Amino acid sequence: MRIAITTPTGNIGRELTKRLLDQRGTQLILLARTPDKLKKEQARGAKVVKADLGDAASVKKATQGADALFFLCPPSFAVPNYRAYYVGLAKNGAEAVKANKVKHTVLLSSVGAHLSKGTGPILGLYDAEKIFSKATQGLTILRPTWFMENHLWHLDEIKNMNSIFMPLSGNLKAPMIATVDVADRAARVITGPAPSRPTIVPLHGPKDYSLDECAKIIGRAIGKEVRHVQVPPAKAKEAMIGMGATENVADTMLEMYAAFQAGTLKDEAKRSPETTTPTTFETFVKNVLLPALKG
């Protein structure tokens, strides 16, 4: 089975690649802007193809001969319009799927992608789901919730100020998931049979966590108190632009945060044993966040 993977150096793509390289009967095609970053994977038998998801011809050529495709729209703070950026990538991917008759596509989407307004960058994934659904019936849509890895954006704040600054209240609770668990489910799905029509797979992590609770867990792990601090949206926007975000990206992120705060950005599916995944926030902190703090 020949499986093409986009963004193979990202958190999810990297873990998915590891899992599939360990499985017999899979041949991987890794689409990468910088193939040199994948020498280890190439040495293990993966075919590494230089490709740019923003170039339709490049994606089409790279996915020739693929039986399945894992498609992830990589986030970018530098784009002038976040939604248009996602739509462009999705169109390129969908055209490649249709042209190359890829039997099974696994699209990484997001919680809230069923909503047509008010969700900021997730609106681009709402569009992406529609675009791929028109291109193929063999589509599995993964809708994970809030990534635990989002806390990695706050490493400097944790190190230097023992705080995490966000435009959200500390008592806000949300399901959170580790990207390793998303990769686990993606590996299971993409090596299974293709669906006969577009199918949605919600992923809710182990439980709901409040942001105050996350700060306390991090504090216990590093041996000092860490606080969650709610900041005004204007301060959050200033910080994002300082990190390189365009004004449009910052505004769409604030729209998403506002939807989380209001409780309108939530999954239409209820938690179940099938949507619950094993990695706890404590395990994420131990295995991922602590090494990142020390690194």
PLM regions: where:
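Aromatic "clamp/platform" in nucleotide-sugar-dependent glycosyltransferases that forms part
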Residues: Y85-A90
